[in-house]
Protein backbone atom coordinates (compact mmCIF):
# COMPACT_ATOMS: atom_id res chain seq x y z
CA UNK A 1 0.00 0.00 0.00
CA UNK A 2 2.82 2.37 0.90
CA UNK A 3 4.55 1.54 -2.37
CA UNK A 4 1.34 2.23 -4.29
CA UNK A 5 0.84 5.56 -2.55
CA UNK A 6 4.47 6.47 -3.20
CA UNK A 7 4.06 5.56 -6.87
CA UNK A 8 0.89 7.65 -7.16
CA UNK A 9 2.57 10.58 -5.44
CA UNK A 10 5.55 10.32 -7.77
CA UNK A 11 3.24 10.17 -10.81
CA UNK A 12 1.26 13.19 -9.61
CA UNK A 13 4.45 15.12 -9.03
CA UNK A 14 5.70 14.21 -12.49
CA UNK A 15 2.43 15.29 -14.13
CA UNK A 16 2.46 18.53 -12.18
CA UNK A 17 6.02 19.21 -13.23
CA UNK A 18 5.22 18.43 -16.87
CA UNK A 19 2.08 20.57 -16.87
CA UNK A 20 4.13 23.53 -15.67
CA UNK A 21 5.99 23.30 -19.02
CA UNK A 22 2.82 23.49 -21.10
CA UNK A 23 0.99 26.73 -21.88
CA UNK A 24 -2.48 26.56 -23.46
CA UNK A 25 -4.36 29.47 -24.93
CA UNK A 26 -6.62 30.88 -27.62
CA UNK A 27 -5.68 32.78 -30.76
CA UNK A 28 -7.46 34.76 -33.49
CA UNK A 29 -5.83 35.86 -36.74
CA UNK A 30 -7.45 38.27 -39.19
CA UNK A 31 -5.54 37.91 -42.45
CA UNK A 32 -5.19 38.73 -46.12
CA UNK A 33 -5.27 35.56 -48.23
CA UNK A 34 -4.59 34.89 -51.89
CA UNK A 35 -4.04 32.09 -54.39
CA UNK A 36 -0.80 31.76 -56.36
CA UNK A 37 -1.88 30.40 -59.74
CA UNK A 38 0.13 29.58 -62.85
CA UNK A 39 0.00 27.38 -65.93
CA UNK A 40 1.21 27.23 -69.51
CA UNK A 41 0.49 30.26 -71.70
CA UNK A 42 -2.43 28.48 -73.38
CA UNK A 43 -4.62 28.85 -70.28
CA UNK A 44 -2.62 31.61 -68.55
CA UNK A 45 -3.69 30.97 -64.96
CA UNK A 46 -2.84 33.88 -62.64
CA UNK A 47 -3.84 35.42 -59.33
CA UNK A 48 -6.68 37.92 -59.68
CA UNK A 49 -6.90 39.42 -56.21
CA UNK A 50 -6.82 38.72 -52.49
CA UNK A 51 -9.57 38.49 -49.90
CA UNK A 52 -10.07 38.89 -46.16
CA UNK A 53 -9.72 35.72 -44.12
CA UNK A 54 -10.03 34.82 -40.48
CA UNK A 55 -8.66 31.99 -38.38
CA UNK A 56 -8.81 31.09 -34.72
CA UNK A 57 -8.48 28.25 -32.31
CA UNK A 58 -6.39 26.55 -29.66
CA UNK A 59 -2.68 27.19 -29.06
CA UNK A 60 -0.45 24.74 -27.16
CA UNK A 61 3.18 25.62 -26.36
CA UNK A 62 5.26 22.79 -24.90
CA UNK A 63 8.52 24.15 -23.49
CA UNK A 64 11.63 21.99 -23.69
CA UNK A 65 13.84 24.82 -22.43
CA UNK A 66 13.36 28.22 -20.82
CA UNK A 67 13.34 29.98 -24.19
CA UNK A 68 12.33 27.17 -26.55
CA UNK A 69 8.93 25.62 -27.19
CA UNK A 70 7.24 23.23 -29.58
CA UNK A 71 4.06 25.02 -30.62
CA UNK A 72 0.98 23.30 -32.02
CA UNK A 73 -2.80 23.53 -31.68
CA UNK A 74 -6.00 23.22 -33.67
CA UNK A 75 -7.38 26.09 -35.72
CA UNK A 76 -10.19 26.85 -38.14
CA UNK A 77 -8.69 28.91 -40.97
CA UNK A 78 -10.31 30.68 -43.91
CA UNK A 79 -8.19 30.90 -47.06
CA UNK A 80 -8.60 31.60 -50.74
CA UNK A 81 -8.62 34.34 -53.32
CA UNK A 82 -9.53 35.08 -56.92
CA UNK A 83 -7.90 33.54 -59.98
CA UNK A 84 -8.29 34.13 -63.70
CA UNK A 85 -7.55 31.98 -66.73
CA UNK A 86 -8.26 31.66 -70.44
CA UNK A 87 -10.76 29.04 -71.58
CA UNK A 88 -11.94 27.97 -75.03
CA UNK A 89 -15.36 27.16 -76.41
CA UNK A 90 -14.18 23.71 -77.51
CA UNK A 91 -13.53 22.51 -73.93
CA UNK A 92 -10.14 24.11 -73.51
CA UNK A 93 -8.00 22.34 -76.11
CA UNK A 94 -6.84 25.69 -77.37
CA UNK A 95 -8.22 25.81 -80.92
CA UNK A 96 -11.59 27.51 -80.34
CA UNK A 97 -12.52 31.04 -79.41
CA UNK A 98 -10.70 32.11 -76.22
CA UNK A 99 -12.47 33.99 -73.46
CA UNK A 100 -11.42 35.04 -69.93
CA UNK A 101 -12.78 33.37 -66.80
CA UNK A 102 -12.47 34.68 -63.25
CA UNK A 103 -13.50 32.85 -60.10
CA UNK A 104 -13.31 33.54 -56.36
CA UNK A 105 -12.48 30.47 -54.27
CA UNK A 106 -13.00 30.48 -50.48
CA UNK A 107 -12.09 27.43 -48.40
CA UNK A 108 -12.30 26.67 -44.68
CA UNK A 109 -9.53 24.45 -43.33
CA UNK A 110 -8.89 22.58 -40.11
CA UNK A 111 -5.29 23.51 -39.46
CA UNK A 112 -2.67 21.90 -37.21
CA UNK A 113 0.49 24.01 -36.77
CA UNK A 114 3.75 22.13 -36.16
CA UNK A 115 6.33 24.75 -35.27
CA UNK A 116 9.18 25.76 -32.99
CA UNK A 117 9.00 29.01 -31.02
CA UNK A 118 12.18 30.77 -29.91
CA UNK A 119 11.85 33.36 -27.14
CA UNK A 120 14.28 36.12 -26.20
CA UNK A 121 15.01 37.14 -22.63
CA UNK A 122 12.95 40.06 -21.34
CA UNK A 123 13.47 43.19 -23.43
CA UNK A 124 11.23 45.20 -21.06
CA UNK A 125 9.47 44.34 -17.80
CA UNK A 126 7.38 41.16 -18.36
CA UNK A 127 7.89 41.43 -22.13
CA UNK A 128 9.86 39.25 -24.51
CA UNK A 129 9.95 38.65 -28.25
CA UNK A 130 9.29 35.36 -30.01
CA UNK A 131 10.17 33.94 -33.41
CA UNK A 132 8.25 31.01 -34.85
CA UNK A 133 9.17 28.70 -37.73
CA UNK A 134 7.77 25.44 -39.05
CA UNK A 135 4.64 24.49 -40.95
CA UNK A 136 1.05 23.38 -40.72
CA UNK A 137 -1.08 20.49 -41.96
CA UNK A 138 -4.48 21.51 -43.33
CA UNK A 139 -7.66 19.63 -44.28
CA UNK A 140 -10.45 21.44 -46.18
CA UNK A 141 -13.91 21.17 -44.61
CA UNK A 142 -15.87 23.54 -46.83
CA UNK A 143 -15.46 25.43 -50.10
CA UNK A 144 -17.42 28.07 -51.99
CA UNK A 145 -16.81 29.42 -55.48
CA UNK A 146 -18.19 32.89 -56.14
CA UNK A 147 -20.07 32.52 -52.86
CA UNK A 148 -21.84 29.29 -53.84
CA UNK A 149 -21.43 25.66 -52.82
CA UNK A 150 -21.89 24.57 -56.46
CA UNK A 151 -20.25 25.92 -59.62
CA UNK A 152 -21.16 25.59 -63.30
CA UNK A 153 -18.19 25.19 -65.62
CA UNK A 154 -18.73 27.98 -68.21
CA UNK A 155 -17.59 25.75 -71.11
CA UNK A 156 -18.88 22.26 -70.31
CA UNK A 157 -21.99 23.44 -68.46
CA UNK A 158 -21.34 20.76 -65.84
CA UNK A 159 -22.35 21.62 -62.27
CA UNK A 160 -19.96 20.38 -59.59
CA UNK A 161 -19.58 20.85 -55.88
CA UNK A 162 -17.17 23.67 -55.16
CA UNK A 163 -15.23 21.27 -52.95
CA UNK A 164 -14.51 19.08 -56.00
CA UNK A 165 -12.15 21.78 -57.26
CA UNK A 166 -9.93 21.56 -54.14
CA UNK A 167 -7.42 18.85 -53.21
CA UNK A 168 -8.21 16.98 -49.98
CA UNK A 169 -4.99 18.07 -48.21
CA UNK A 170 -2.73 21.10 -47.93
CA UNK A 171 0.49 21.94 -46.10
CA UNK A 172 2.08 25.32 -45.39
CA UNK A 173 5.47 26.67 -44.50
CA UNK A 174 4.98 29.08 -41.58
CA UNK A 175 7.08 31.93 -40.22
CA UNK A 176 5.96 34.39 -37.55
CA UNK A 177 7.31 36.89 -35.06
CA UNK A 178 5.81 38.89 -32.24
CA UNK A 179 5.86 39.89 -28.59
CA UNK A 180 4.51 38.25 -25.45
CA UNK A 181 3.51 40.11 -22.28
CA UNK A 182 3.04 38.44 -18.89
CA UNK A 183 0.01 39.75 -16.99
CA UNK A 184 0.28 37.57 -13.92
CA UNK A 185 1.60 34.27 -12.69
CA UNK A 186 0.45 32.33 -15.74
CA UNK A 187 -1.65 34.65 -17.93
CA UNK A 188 0.10 35.99 -21.02
CA UNK A 189 -0.97 38.13 -23.96
CA UNK A 190 0.74 37.90 -27.32
CA UNK A 191 0.59 39.66 -30.67
CA UNK A 192 2.53 39.12 -33.86
CA UNK A 193 2.60 38.78 -37.62
CA UNK A 194 2.53 35.44 -39.44
CA UNK A 195 2.97 34.26 -43.03
CA UNK A 196 1.65 30.93 -44.35
CA UNK A 197 2.97 29.84 -47.76
CA UNK A 198 1.17 26.88 -49.29
CA UNK A 199 3.36 24.03 -50.48
CA UNK A 200 0.74 21.76 -52.07
CA UNK A 201 -0.96 22.25 -55.43
CA UNK A 202 -4.63 22.34 -54.42
CA UNK A 203 -6.05 22.07 -57.97
CA UNK A 204 -8.28 19.00 -58.13
CA UNK A 205 -10.25 19.87 -61.26
CA UNK A 206 -8.54 21.69 -64.11
CA UNK A 207 -5.87 19.10 -64.87
CA UNK A 208 -7.77 15.95 -63.93
CA UNK A 209 -11.25 16.87 -65.25
CA UNK A 210 -10.57 19.42 -68.00
CA UNK A 211 -7.19 18.19 -69.23
CA UNK A 212 -5.43 21.54 -68.79
CA UNK A 213 -1.62 21.38 -68.71
CA UNK A 214 0.66 22.25 -65.78
CA UNK A 215 -1.92 24.10 -63.68
CA UNK A 216 -0.69 24.97 -60.18
CA UNK A 217 -2.77 26.71 -57.49
CA UNK A 218 -1.36 27.30 -54.00
CA UNK A 219 -2.52 29.17 -50.90
CA UNK A 220 -0.85 32.16 -49.27
CA UNK A 221 -1.91 34.19 -46.25
CA UNK A 222 -0.46 37.03 -44.17
CA UNK A 223 -2.10 37.71 -40.85
CA UNK A 224 -2.11 39.43 -37.48
CA UNK A 225 -1.92 36.95 -34.58
CA UNK A 226 -3.65 37.99 -31.33
CA UNK A 227 -4.03 35.69 -28.37
CA UNK A 228 -3.99 34.86 -24.70
CA UNK A 229 -2.39 31.95 -22.83
CA UNK A 230 -3.41 30.70 -19.41
Model-derived segments and spans:
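Bacterial Sec-dependent N-terminal signal peptides
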Residues: 1-27, 226-230
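Short glycine/proline- and aromatic-enriched beta-strand/turn motifs that initiate or cap beta-hairpins
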Residues: 20-59, 229
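Residues on the lipid-exposed face of transmembrane beta-strands in outer-membrane beta-barrel proteins
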Residues: 26-30, 54-62, 66, 74-76, ...
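Extracellular/periplasm-exposed beta-strand and loop segments of Gram-negative cell-envelope proteins
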Residues: 34-51, 79-110, 139-170, 201-223
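Hydrophobic, well-structured mid-protein blocks that either form specific transmembrane helices
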Residues: 94-135
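Predominantly the C-terminal beta-signal and adjacent terminal strand-loop region
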Residues: 170-175, 179-230
Amino acid sequence: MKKLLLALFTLAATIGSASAQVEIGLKVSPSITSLRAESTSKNSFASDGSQFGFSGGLVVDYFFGENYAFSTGLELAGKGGSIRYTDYLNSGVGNGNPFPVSMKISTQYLQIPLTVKLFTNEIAPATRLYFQVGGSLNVPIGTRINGNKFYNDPVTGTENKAGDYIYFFDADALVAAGAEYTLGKSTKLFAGLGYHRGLVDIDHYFESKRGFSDVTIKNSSFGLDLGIKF
